[in-house]
């Protein structure tokens, strides 16, 4: 019996950070190690071009960095197919066929797209590729017959749009060749969207308020020591607030079961006074380094042999293309356009 299929990926627009790690990467490794699924993980460079068309060098430079991030967190190319979206031309052809089943009005109603258009300040100059990228996502998902797609809650409209396209295609062409996917959403929404070190609602590459998976130990230390805490906690003996204090927020997310007694005691001590921010930050640093040290070690090993990293991407893309080609053939048969 074949395993259920999972598809997931990232836009290669820069290095990945702790927000990506707790939001998706760590869970991908757990799913991989369960050995219950066939997994495809991809670098969505074509999607990144929808709002970086004039900055393609950023995407090119990011491919290797994101691949290193994948491998360093523990994704295993022997267990997971890692590929580059643009190396699978079948995805673009599938997108074209699906576009004929989706109205412009439906795309414009997609709440995720509407929010992102406003955030990016496109105004009336919306790139066509950006507006239709939910259809491209549907092609990505259906090409690999994904049963499950791990995404954040903000991506629920994208999953629903893919499900609509699958139902429309299968009904129109009287087939069942496309698989209707299900989203896998974060159980802990707080962990799924890690705030920035400065207390900003989201850790972001553009805001420069994150800890990158590629940061060395000294850089991580400096960033942790500059974290936002309680601005009114001026003296050690002063009572402090843990609400909105990023150090305690991070401890809640990164602390393991065996850390909970110490963290609870620290919270009580901090709130009653007598515990300084330097001590809490050093404790958090130890917790973070417990996660980051093995990641950093694996990254250094892969950095010594970038030819191996590129070979992993090349072989993964070849494997992925075989699967996508089979799906495309089935789609064309259903449509009656397999002429020869």
Curated annotation (Swiss-Prot):
It is found in: Cytoplasm. It comes from the Bacteria. Its main location: cytoplasm. It holds the Pfam family tRNA-synt_1b. It catalyses: tRNA(Trp) + L-tryptophan + ATP = L-tryptophyl-tRNA(Trp) + AMP + diphosphate + H(+). CDD domains: TrpRS_core (cd00806). GO terms for biological process: tryptophanyl-tRNA aminoacylation. A motif ('KMSKS' region) lies at residues 202-206. Keywords: Aminoacyl-tRNA synthetase, ATP-binding, Cytoplasm, Ligase, Nucleotide-binding, Protein biosynthesis. A motif ('HIGH' region) lies at residues 12-20. GO terms for cellular component: cytosol. One of its GO terms (molecular function) is ATP binding. It is an enzyme of class 6 (ligase). InterPro entries: aa-tRNA-synth_I_CS (IPR001412), aa-tRNA-synth_Ic (IPR002305), Rossmann-like_a/b/a_fold (IPR014729), Trp-tRNA-ligase (IPR002306), Trp-tRNA-ligase_bac-type (IPR024109), Trp-tRNA_synthetase (IPR050203). Gene3D superfamilies: HUPs, Tyrosyl-Transfer RNA Synthetase. Its EC number is 6.1.1.2. L-tryptophan binds at residue 140. HAMAP family: Trp_tRNA_synth_B (MF_00140_B). Catalyzes the attachment of tryptophan to tRNA(Trp). PANTHER family: TRYPTOPHAN--TRNA LIGASE, MITOCHONDRIAL. Homodimer. Belongs to the class-I aminoacyl-tRNA synthetase family. This is Tryptophan--tRNA ligase. It comes from Streptococcus mutans serotype c (strain ATCC 700610 / UA159). The gene is trpS.
């Amino acid at each position: 019996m074949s395993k259920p299929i999972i598809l997931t990926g990232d836009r290669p627009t820069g290095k990945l950070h702790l927000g990506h790690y707790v939001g998706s990467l760590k869970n991908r490794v757990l799913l991989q190690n369960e050995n219950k699924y066939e997994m495809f993980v991809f670098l969505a460079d074509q999607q990144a071009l929808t709002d970086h068309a004039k900055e393609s060098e950023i995407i090119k430079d990011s491919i290797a960095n994101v691949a290193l991030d994948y491998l360093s967190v523990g994704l295993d190319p022997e267990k997971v197919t890692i590929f580059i979206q643009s190396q699978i031309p079948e995805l673009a052809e599938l997108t074209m066929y699906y576009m004929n089943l989706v109205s412009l009005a439906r795309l414009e109603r997609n709440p995720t797209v509407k929010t992102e258009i406003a955030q990016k300040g496109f105004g009336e100059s919306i790139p066509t590729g950006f507006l239709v990228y939910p259809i491209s996502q549907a092609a990505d998902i259906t090409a690999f017959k994904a049963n499950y797609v791990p995404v954040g809650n903000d991506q629920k409209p994208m999953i629903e749009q893919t499900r609509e396209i699958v139902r429309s295609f299968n009904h129109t062409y009287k087939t069942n060749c496309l698989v209707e996917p299900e989203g896998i959403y974060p159980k802990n929404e707080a962990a799924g969207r890690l705030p920035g070190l400065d207390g900003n609602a989201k850790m972001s590459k553009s805001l420069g308020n994150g800890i990158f998976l590629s940061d060395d130990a000294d850089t991580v230390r400096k960033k942790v020591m500059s974290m936002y805490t309680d601005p009114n906690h001026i003296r050690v003996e002063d009572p402090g607030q843990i609400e909105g204090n990023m150090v305690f927020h991070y401890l809640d997310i990164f602390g393991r079961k065996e850390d909970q007694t110490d963290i609870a005691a620290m919270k009580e001590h901090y709130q009653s006074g007598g515990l300084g921010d330097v001590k809490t930050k050093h404790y958090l640093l130890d917790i973070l380094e417990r996660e980051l040290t093995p990641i950093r070690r694996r990254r250094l090993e892969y950095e010594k042999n970038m030819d191996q990293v590129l070979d992993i991407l090349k072989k993964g893309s070849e494997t992925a293309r075989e699967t996508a080609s089979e799906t495309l053939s089935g789609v064309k048969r259903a449509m009656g356009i397999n002429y020869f």
